[in-house]
Amino acid sequence: MAVKIRLARSGAKKCAYFKIVIANNCSPRDGAFIEKVGHYNPMLPKDNHERVILKTDRIEHWLSHGAQPTEKVINFLQQFSITLPLAIQKKHNIKLKNYVAKPSKKSK
């Protein structure tokens, strides 16, 4: 069973609110989850400390058991200075290198 750390949408229409959950890879986005480990409210200002709340101890537990975070969750984990396993760090760095523009070969 592959486990992911991902966002599950909730809230009213045009007023999104996301739960950060541990869920089975096969379950739907807003479907059943194993554990809620935080929440994200994009409606709050970026400098508000309540915009992203994480249970760091539980996230570290699930990462040590092989849970794979999504790209957005990786960004949140980096904001909270949570160390990721080496395999996830390598995978994330490879994706960042793909977005770097290559210099043009025209020298004239």
From Swiss-Prot:
UniProt keyword annotation of Ribonucleoprotein present: yes
Coiled coil feature spans: none
GO molecular function list: structural constituent of ribosome
Gene Ontology cellular component list: cytoplasm; small ribosomal subunit
Stored Pfam families: Ribosomal_S16
Keywords: Ribonucleoprotein, Ribosomal protein
Origin superkingdom: Bacteria
Protein's GO biological process: translation
Record family assignment: Belongs to the bacterial ribosomal protein bS16 family.
HAMAP family per UniProt: Ribosomal_bS16
PANTHER family: 30S RIBOSOMAL PROTEIN S16, SMALL RIBOSOMAL SUBUNIT PROTEIN BS16M
Protein name from the UniProt record: Small ribosomal subunit protein bS16
Organism phylogeny: Bacteria, Pseudomonadati, Pseudomonadota, Alphaproteobacteria, Rickettsiales
